[in-house]
Amino acid sequence: KKVEPILDIHSIPAPHRIKASLDDYVVGQEHAKKVMSVAVYNHYKRVMADNKHKAQEENTTAKQASNKYDGVEIEKSNMLMIGPTGSGKTYLVKTLAKLLDVPLAITDATSLTEAGYIGDDIESVVSKLLAAADNDVERAEHGIIFIDEIDKLAKKRNANQRDVSGESVQQGMLKLLEGSEVEVPVGASSKNAMVPMTTVDTRNILFICGGAFPGLEDIIKERLNKEASIGFKADLKDKYDGDENLLMHCLLYTSPSPRDRG
């Protein structure tokens, strides 16, 4: 069944409507669809509020602006999808992008390297998004970037060898995730003196990272059983029963870098 764009990001519908649209194309994964629908709704609601605020500022004189309360700025947020290979993470993101009619760029984190080395640098992902938006900067700035295999960006254990595809890539990625202006080539995948450059602001781009995080279940089991007591009077109840932050605690052990854990 071909996915037709039926949702408008300029008047983003309620999360239950987004989820209902996903139900027409994606079978199962109920929890993932619900969480993603809420996250997308919150993201584009913030984007539209930000655009409205900028438009009001352009139509406001300096004197009026000084007397106007700007309100609270809503910080940018991104998404992390955890699931085994073949569970439908990429398909879910593709379907969502088509329903919203926004450009989508998909990349594999294992192909990313530090700028200047063989491979794609992190800024090339923004170039792909611009190309998907037919070089329309404004449309690209409202798009989605999906970075798969994010768990493969863990820092290499060999400290004597330069890490060009691990922590160095993470540092460059953090700038984009937090929101920054990036210069990218127009109509090309790499920077070239003969290719015109343009600036893309990543503040309103939705970044979705996906990964299998192998070994995470073992870390959770180890954490649960570490302080387990033995004997006839042992307390058999898990210490972390009902701990909503358990997954986040365990991700600390598999997260690529300390700053990415946020």
Predicted regions located by residue number:
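Conserved small/polar residues in nucleotide/adenosyl-binding loops
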Residues: 253-260
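Pre-Walker A (pre-P-loop) alpha-helix and adjacent loop at the N terminus of AAA/AAA+ ATPase modules
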Residues: 13-76
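Conserved catalytic network of the ASCE P-loop NTPase/AAA+ motor domain
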Residues: 71-74, 97-99, 134-140, 165-167, ...
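Interdomain "pre-motor" coupling segment immediately N-terminal to P-loop NTPase/helicase cores
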Residues: 1-10
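Walker A/P-loop
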Residues: 70-72, 79-106
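AAA+/P-loop NTPase substrate/partner-engagement loops
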Residues: 99-124
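Conserved alpha-helical scaffold flanking the Walker A/P-loop in AAA+ ATPase domains
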Residues: 124-142
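Conserved P-loop NTPase nucleotide-binding/switch module
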Residues: 150-189, 198-204, 208-235
